[in-house]
């Protein structure tokens, strides 16, 4: 590209270097099948989360599946609240409509039952009752007087008293007196029965009147709501039940204010409330499908929960206290979860699988309430590491059933013109987005060099854009400190060097230890059975190369090669394997006509923290051959590379860091033009060295040797032909064998 600075080029609008991942993601999003959920794997910083959200929002914008979800009271089974799906915005409308309905009815009922017309109609019914009641009482009163008794009403009923108490009852026979009294009492029973029957008829008539008025009050409101929600069968049924319930319990609507407050806050009026479970009217992107990211996937956060009231040691809840989870809010769209966080909650993972299996979002409570489950319509995107993917795939048989699409993010991409241009456009995008100083072309080239260094391969670029982004932000900051309009190459270099300075405390202390002579490393002279091996140490995000003194001693015996680190449990399995390979090499090259009879001890001197990896196996072989042959090894050359049993030198990691680590030691002790390193030839493409080391190599102050075979390396280290060394080693092993044979005799 021809440009002076990144303000002149188009910002990057796509994910860079992830063609395989993009194709897989597109496939997963296009297949509308509940088993085709997506697992995105990749190293931190490769942009998988950023890309996932970007592409999900793009797909979400193409389909408007936002729905509202409400829980309503179940009149047939109150323990099982009903879930209702409504068009976006209708949930909020329904909630408001029901609140207005109750408010209106409270006022309308009060007006209706306090109206003059109602009192007139009610009194008319009651007057009819009173007239008939009076007629019955008059009849029995008259008849009683004819029989000589006065009628008296009490709480116990009707009582008859003789009219003339002073009159001698002997004037009448006892039989006549009691006969008349019994007759009147029987008649009174019939009258009381008829009066009570009249009361029931009157009460029923008044109730029918009240119900008729209640219907006149309620039906217009319910009819209006039924028309508004005519497309929702569950709402139609609910409103019909509401009407019946209000008419049945209409007395609640004309209680005084204090009584009503208690009733409304507690029991009956809960039936008329709406739980707006998922309100998508309030979502940011109302015209697209939901995209939900849940960073704390606890069971409650994923699948919802119920809130509880505690009273007298008991817990109580109802459908209005049900709260939605991420699965509910994402329904009709996409849900993004992070695998490492999800697996912290074992129950979440198990319920998730059950949800995918049943195709229903399972909301569990601690009480008897069992809400109807929401039907599942979610594309699940799980983001995590390759390690977690492998573990789930291998040990969870359900994982493969529900995550059919694997989106694999690479940590590197080919170093070509298109991708280099992509990095320049990435920088342009970040500068525009974050208001940074735009980068000059030379500054961009320095960032590209940094990306190559991150990849550890001259033919690759890193896709760890979080690391690249750090350099971009910090480089821009240093340009701003200089009051420069643009970020220059020097700003990028300073950002990289200053970052290293902030995190290389351990490396600095180890350099000081070598300089002070506390750690024994020599960069001049020759020694038998001593070699400088190269390794990489990591402290958090920082890795650096170190030289370690490796020594070997040999003697007659039968122990074979003894890895001292292994004996004290300070070496890992890969390092142990590398040491065992040494025995295979020695057996093939020196023990075809004799038994190996030696004790060989190999040790990383002054190693107090353990070791793993096989990159020092070649150095261990060279130092063994030196000890056996008596040929000294140059201390000005350090070695890295693994070997196989056939003597081939194999590639290793961290090659640039190892070279720079030994160069730093040589620089501290004084460069003499003879110092250098031996590396595997196939590692040449991994040499992404600092400018200082490149300059030193170019100027002949430091050397890098590449080898493919053990024979090449040992000759560089000793200036002795391999055949001569082989002869000396063979002679020593023969002498060891003889000594061992004599000792056995």
Predicted regions and their residues:
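Conserved ASCE/P-loop NTPase catalytic core
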Residues: 1-393, 398, 404-416, 420, ...
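Peripheral, non-AAA+ core regions of ATP-driven protein-machinery
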Residues: 318-320, 327, 333, 339-346, ...
């Amino acid at each position: 590209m021809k440009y002076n600075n990144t303000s002149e080029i188009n910002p990057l609008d796509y994910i860079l270097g992830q063609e395989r991942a993009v194709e897989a993601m597109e496939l997963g999003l296009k297949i509308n099948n509940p088993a085709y959920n997506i697992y995105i794997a990749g190293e931190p910083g490769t942009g998988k989360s950023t890309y996932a959200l970007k592409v999900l929002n793009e797909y979400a914008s193409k389909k408007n599946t936002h729905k509202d979800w409400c829980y309503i009271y179940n009149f047939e089974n109150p323990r099982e609240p009903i879930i209702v799906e409504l068009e976006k915005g209708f949930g909020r409308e329904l909630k408001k409509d029901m609140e207005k309905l109750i408010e209106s009815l409270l006022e309308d009922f009060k007006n209706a039952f306090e109206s003059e017309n109602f009192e007139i109609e009610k009194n008319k019914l009651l007057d009819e009752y009173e007239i008939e009641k009076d007629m019955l009482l008059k009849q029995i009163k008259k008849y009683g007087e004819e029989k000589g008794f006065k009628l008296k009403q009490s709480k116990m009923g009707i009582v008859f008293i003789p009219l003339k108490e002073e009159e001698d009852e002997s004037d009448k026979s006892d039989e006549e007196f009691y006969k008349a009294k019994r007759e009147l009492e029987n008649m009174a029973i019939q009258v009381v029965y008829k009066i009570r029957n009249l009361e029931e008829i009157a009460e029923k008539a008044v109730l029918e009147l009240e119900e008729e008025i209640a219907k006149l009050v309620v039906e217009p409101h319910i009819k209006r709501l039924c028309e508004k929600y005519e497309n929702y069968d569950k709402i139609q049924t609910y409103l019909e039940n509401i009407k019946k319930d209000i008419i049945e319990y209409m007395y609640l609507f004309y209680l005084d204010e204090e009584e009503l407050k208690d009733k409304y806050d507690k029991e009956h009026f809960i039936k008329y409330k709406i739980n707006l479970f998922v309100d998508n009217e309030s979502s940011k992107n109302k015209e697209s499908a939901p995209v939900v990211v849940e960073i704390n996937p606890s069971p409650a956060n994923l699948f919802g929960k119920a809130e509880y009231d505690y009273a007298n040691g008991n817990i109580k809840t109802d459908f209005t206290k049900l709260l939605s989870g991420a699965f509910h809010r994402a329904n009709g769209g996409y849900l993004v979860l992070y695998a490492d966080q999800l697996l912290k909650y074992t129950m979440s993972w198990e319920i998730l699988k059950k949800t995918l299996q049943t195709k229903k979002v399972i909301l569990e409570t601690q009480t008897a309430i069992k809400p109807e489950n929401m039907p599942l319509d979610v594309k699940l995107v799980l983001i995590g590491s390759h390690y977690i993917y492998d573990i789930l795939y291998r040990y969870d048989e359900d994982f493969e059933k529900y995550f059919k699409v694997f989106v694999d993010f690479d940590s590197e991409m080919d170093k070509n013109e298109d991708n280099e241009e992509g990095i320049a456009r990435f920088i342009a995008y970040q500068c525009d987005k974050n208001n940074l100083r735009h980068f000059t072309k030379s500054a961009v080239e320095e960032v590209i060099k940094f990306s190559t260094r991150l990849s550890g391969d001259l033919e690759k670029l890193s896709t760890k854009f979080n690391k690249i982004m750090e350099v971009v932000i910090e480089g821009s900051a240093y340009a701003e400190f200089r009051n420069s309009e643009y970020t220059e190459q020097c700003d990028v270099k300073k950002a990289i060097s200053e970052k290293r300075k902030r995190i290389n405390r351990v490396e600095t202390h180890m350099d000081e230890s070598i300089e002070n002579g506390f750690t024994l490393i020599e960069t001049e002279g020759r020694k038998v059975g001593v070699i400088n091996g190269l390794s990489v140490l990591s402290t958090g995000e920082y890795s650096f190369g170190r030289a370690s003194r490796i020594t070997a001693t040999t003697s007659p015996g039968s122990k074979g090669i003894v890895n001292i680190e292994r004996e004290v449990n300070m070496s890992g399995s890969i390092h142990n394997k590398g040491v065992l390979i040494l025995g295979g090499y020695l057996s093939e090259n020196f023990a075809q006509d004799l038994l190996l009879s030696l004790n060989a001890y190999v040790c990383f001197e002054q190693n107090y923290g353990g070791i793993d990896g096989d990159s020092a196996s070649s150095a261990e072989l060279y130092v063994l051959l030196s000890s056996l042959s008596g040929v000294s090894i140059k201390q000005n050359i350090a070695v890295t590379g693994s070997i196989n049993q056939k003597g081939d030198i194999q590639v290793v990691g961290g090659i640039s860091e190892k070279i720079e680590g030994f160069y730093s030691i040589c620089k501290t002790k004084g460069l003499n033009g003879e110092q250098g390193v031996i590396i595997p030839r196939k590692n040449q493409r991994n040499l992404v060295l600092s400018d200082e080391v490149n300059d030193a190599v170019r100027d002949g102050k430091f050397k890098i040797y590449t080898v493919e075979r053990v024979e090449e390396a040992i000759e560089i280290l000793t200036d002795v032909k391999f055949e001569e060394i082989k002869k000396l080693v063979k002679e020593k092993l023969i002498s060891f064998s003889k000594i061992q044979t004599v000792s056995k005799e």
